[in-house]
Amino acid sequence: MGTAQVLPGILQKHCCILPDRNTESQCTLCGEPEEEEGGDLAQPGLSFPGPAEEDIDQQYSWSPTQHFSEERYSPAPRNMKGLTGSRNQPQLCVGHTCGLSPTDECEHPHDHVRHGPDVRQPYLLSPAESCPMDHHRCSPRSSVHSECMMMPVMLGDHVSSSTFPRMHYSSHYDTRDDCATSHASTKVNRIPANLLDQFEKQLPLHRDGFHTLQYHRASAATEQRNESPGRIRHLVHSVQKLFTKSHSLEGSSKSNINGTKSEGRMDDHHQSHLSKHSKRSKSKERKPESKHKSGMSSWWSSDDNLDSDSTYRTPSVAHRHHMDHIPHCYPEALQSPFGDLSLKTSKSNSDVKCSACEGLALTPDTRYMKRSSWSTLTVSQAKEAYRKSSLNLDKPLVHPEIKPSLQPCHYLQVPQDDWGAYPTGGKEEEIPCRRMRSGSYIKAMGDEESGESDSSPKTSPTVALRPEPLLKSIIQRPLGDHQTQSYLQAATEVPVGHSLDPSVNYNSPKFRSRNQSYMRAVSTLSQASCVSQMSEAEVNGQFESVCESVFSEVESQAMDALDLPGCFRTRSHSYLRAIQAGYSQDDECIPVMTPSNMTSTIRSTAAVSYTNYKKTPPPVPPRTTSKPLISVTAQSSTESTQDAYQDSRAQRMSPWPQDSRGGLYNSMDSLDSNKAMNLALESAAAQRHAADTQSSSTRSIDKAVLVSKAEELLKSRCSSIGVQDSEFPDHQPYPRSDVETATDSDTESRGLREYHSVGVQVEDEKRHGRFKRSNSVTAAVQADLELEGFPGHVSMEDKGLQFGSSFQRHSEPSTPTQYGALRTVRTQGLFSYREDYRTQVDTSTLPPPDPWLEPSLDTVETGRMSPCRRDGSWFLKLLHTETKKMEGWCKEMEREAEENDLSEEILGKIRSAVGSAQLLMSQKFQQFYWLCQQNMDPSAMPRPTSQDLAGYWDMLQLSVEDVSMKFDELHQLKLNDWKIMESPERKEERKIPPPIPKKPPKGKFPITREKSLDLPDRQRQEARRRLMAAKRAASFRQNSATERADSIEIYIPEAQTRL
């Protein structure tokens, strides 16, 4: 307890919180042993019912009561060597955190929790003893949690008296006051009696004390972690700035909250602030400013709250140390009581906390639920959604061991699994202390500084750090556990970490402490992702809905729970979102890594690569390249942020290149088909080698395979399924043309078969990637959902997939070459003309598509059959036919011009017709070809609909009609031996139109005007009208789609900020 010793006075003042921030010792709940144990966090923190502890406990077991006196607390130096009685007393309060002012109450609850006869032991031991198996975890969480479960009231008081000032609720307010007084005395061991009186009078002081304590604790923990207060201070300052921004936005609402909370805490806060300010100064945290700013509002001053979780948590740290547990269980619940400081809050706190600890839905208190509930409710809702989506969160989770804790995570009972679910081991203690650390950004930062994976991501400055620490922690864990934990932790970050492992918990607690409710909601979503990894397709769509519902609910609940730190949440959400995006990136990468371990890891973001990465992990770097594509994912905000972090993440995740590249980058890559294709091309080259080594061995057998691979690569690229894409990229990009024609049918079939084996997976993965995107509210949601329903078979069916996984992937390519390569091969060379319509257009090319379709049909019959429908594939066939026809006309006319000595007038007509046809094919046909490709690419953004294609086709028909008229005229001349038989007037008319037709689209209009009497003209007029109507409709749809995409893109960043 060097820290405790270093900060004895502070520790005394702040009793259990600071003492063992470093330790797993649960100074918060049982914190005494922590000091006793010399920072032995594990058991000491739990403060097993040793005689001394019992004596102290007995001595202070009633400490929650008003009987606590400053002297009394001070005599108990035993809690923490530095704290002396201070820590113990607060812990006694914690012990009596049950909120039972009477010793008996505390004792009984503690006995209940502790399962020990001695209530005083329970006080210290109760947290530890209440969950003996939870000793490490139990101590802080167990104490609160156990007490919470054992004695909701006790929990309230426990929170109140111990580190959970915010958990102190009116119901136990008296006790809490006493407790606070005791606490204050304890904290105020170095505080004058008058301050003690004020503390006693004002519960807020406790919070401030705890708050300060938390900062101090963070500092101490930081120091223990060899982190300088200055560094922590810097981190805190950074976080404060971030939070200040959100706070400025949320300040008003927070002010109200603070008003409520600060009223009761104003004096305490000032006093605590005074005493804590030095400590805060000691930790150099922005909190002192907050406290100064909001003397009374300090607890919940918007600035305090928003400036730092540490403020939010720091005041809470005592409460946070417990509240870390409780907030972990009910981060918001604690807050809400603080906002209310009323009996109802206290009651609700106890009830909710107990329920949360017990894994209840946190239904007890609306506010409690609102705070904890916006996470909790969203979590439970998410779980319900997951269940509905047959995610079977419990089942999908990789490990049964994880499942129990995961459920709590889902239920936002992370505290439960943290406190109750893992009452075993010093990790509980560690986690609580860590959580305390994580409780404040300083702590989180400090943890980051210390290289704690939990805290690293917490601090925005160290957000980048988190991935590595997280990876470290994940890597440190067993691979299976690691994949689950890393994934779960990544997905559910805190909750999963908690549920996964106390160890993991300590990682997640930071997140939890930062914005536990938010983190839980996000974690729940992440867990949904984890679960979705379990059932990829199924989860993705449902995960998307869950994400929407959870995020929306979380947001709404967060707003409802704004009495808690709604502002904090908002700020925390934006900041945490960014952080989570940062660590989530890592987590996603890790989950993606985990997916490598578990193919079913379909984490929305990482899902895409789960199959591919297995096959071709190497492409990760290319994925990293493509990751910039679009950061729109199911966890849109997180993934978007992740996209921002993906480079670093990918680098960090390079150890896990298989998963990270495939999973994390895919969705974003898929989102931006153009970028994805460009990146895909780039990564195709990069991945070519890795993919070639992997898939080349199997697919580089022939060009056809290469072509299919290339197509798949493009498709995968587009869909950001780099693995298989990588396989194909090496071969695909260039052999595409020649291979296309030659190997279209044979190669296509083989490639298709291979592709189906691999390509379908790619598509599935792509779907999953899209799901991520769709989760982030992308237009791909429909396609994703469709694909989701049908992992491989239907996946192709899904529009792009229908046209073959390659089509789906192909549509993404934004580069003509890619399209030509992909589409030509995949499109059966039908649109080879893309690159060179005339050269590409070839019956040989066209037939291959059929064989290719057939193979596709084998894997994705509906997908291959889909071309029969009026979709991109169908229109591509039409376009191909039209192109071939037009090319034939051009060749014929050119041949006629060469073979015959034609007049300049006729030659002009031929040149006009041929030029118009070539221009039409090279421009409008090409455009339409790309539209068809995009239509077939479910990941295309925006993705043209079949109606759009139909409208554009109608438009093309006008141009085609004009060109056809020219060739008809030439044909008539040819039949007439190239003699112009028409009357001068007619000739005039005909002469005029040819020049006009040179203007491809415009020529038709003049012709129409000139030949308004001709039947073709009337038909053209009608066609033009239809075209204009279709064009307007298509334009509207396209604009709407674009707007949707924009709004989505905008929305996602917003979600990133808000969620």
UniProtKB/Swiss-Prot annotation:
<feature type="modified residue" description="Phosphoserine">
    <location>
        <position position="390"/>
    </location>
</feature>
<feature type="modified residue" description="Phosphoserine">
    <location>
        <position position="673"/>
    </location>
</feature>
<dbReference type="GO" id="GO:0045211">
    <property type="term" value="C:postsynaptic membrane"/>
</dbReference>
<feature type="compositionally biased region" description="Polar residues">
    <location>
        <begin position="632"/>
        <end position="645"/>
    </location>
</feature>
<dbReference type="GO" id="GO:0019904">
    <property type="term" value="F:protein domain specific binding"/>
</dbReference>
<dbReference type="GO" id="GO:0099572">
    <property type="term" value="C:postsynaptic specialization"/>
</dbReference>
<dbReference type="GO" id="GO:0004385">
    <property type="term" value="F:guanylate kinase activity"/>
</dbReference>
<feature type="compositionally biased region" description="Basic and acidic residues">
    <location>
        <begin position="1007"/>
        <end position="1024"/>
    </location>
</feature>
<feature type="modified residue" description="Phosphoserine">
    <location>
        <position position="720"/>
    </location>
</feature>
<protein>
    <recommendedName>
        <fullName>Disks large-associated protein 2</fullName>
    </recommendedName>
</protein>
<feature type="modified residue" description="Phosphoserine">
    <location>
        <position position="670"/>
    </location>
</feature>
<feature type="modified residue" description="Phosphoserine">
    <location>
        <position position="308"/>
    </location>
</feature>
<feature type="region of interest" description="Disordered">
    <location>
        <begin position="985"/>
        <end position="1024"/>
    </location>
</feature>
<keyword id="KW-0770">Synapse</keyword>
<dbReference type="GO" id="GO:0043197">
    <property type="term" value="C:dendritic spine"/>
</dbReference>
<feature type="compositionally biased region" description="Basic and acidic residues">
    <location>
        <begin position="262"/>
        <end position="271"/>
    </location>
</feature>
<dbReference type="GO" id="GO:0060090">
    <property type="term" value="F:molecular adaptor activity"/>
</dbReference>
<feature type="modified residue" description="Phosphoserine">
    <location>
        <position position="776"/>
    </location>
</feature>
<feature type="compositionally biased region" description="Polar residues">
    <location>
        <begin position="244"/>
        <end position="261"/>
    </location>
</feature>
<keyword id="KW-1003">Cell membrane</keyword>
<feature type="region of interest" description="Disordered">
    <location>
        <begin position="244"/>
        <end position="311"/>
    </location>
</feature>
<dbReference type="Pfam" id="PF03359">
    <property type="entry name" value="GKAP"/>
</dbReference>
<feature type="modified residue" description="Phosphoserine">
    <location>
        <position position="811"/>
    </location>
</feature>
<dbReference type="GO" id="GO:0050804">
    <property type="term" value="P:modulation of chemical synaptic transmission"/>
</dbReference>
<comment type="subunit">
    <text>Interacts with DLG4/PSD-95.</text>
</comment>
<feature type="modified residue" description="Phosphoserine">
    <location>
        <position position="745"/>
    </location>
</feature>
<comment type="function">
    <text>May play a role in the molecular organization of synapses and neuronal cell signaling. Could be an adapter protein linking ion channel to the subsynaptic cytoskeleton. May induce enrichment of PSD-95/SAP90 at the plasma membrane.</text>
</comment>
<feature type="modified residue" description="Phosphoserine">
    <location>
        <position position="983"/>
    </location>
</feature>
<dbReference type="GO" id="GO:0005883">
    <property type="term" value="C:neurofilament"/>
</dbReference>
<feature type="region of interest" description="Disordered">
    <location>
        <begin position="31"/>
        <end position="56"/>
    </location>
</feature>
<dbReference type="GO" id="GO:0030425">
    <property type="term" value="C:dendrite"/>
</dbReference>
<dbReference type="InterPro" id="IPR005026">
    <property type="entry name" value="SAPAP"/>
</dbReference>
<dbReference type="GO" id="GO:0099092">
    <property type="term" value="C:postsynaptic density, intracellular component"/>
</dbReference>
<keyword id="KW-0597">Phosphoprotein</keyword>
<feature type="compositionally biased region" description="Basic and acidic residues">
    <location>
        <begin position="747"/>
        <end position="756"/>
    </location>
</feature>
<feature type="modified residue" description="Phosphoserine">
    <location>
        <position position="1012"/>
    </location>
</feature>
<dbReference type="GO" id="GO:0098978">
    <property type="term" value="C:glutamatergic synapse"/>
</dbReference>
<feature type="modified residue" description="Phosphoserine">
    <location>
        <position position="456"/>
    </location>
</feature>
<feature type="region of interest" description="Disordered">
    <location>
        <begin position="632"/>
        <end position="669"/>
    </location>
</feature>
<feature type="region of interest" description="Disordered">
    <location>
        <begin position="446"/>
        <end position="466"/>
    </location>
</feature>
<feature type="region of interest" description="Disordered">
    <location>
        <begin position="723"/>
        <end position="756"/>
    </location>
</feature>
<feature type="compositionally biased region" description="Basic residues">
    <location>
        <begin position="272"/>
        <end position="285"/>
    </location>
</feature>
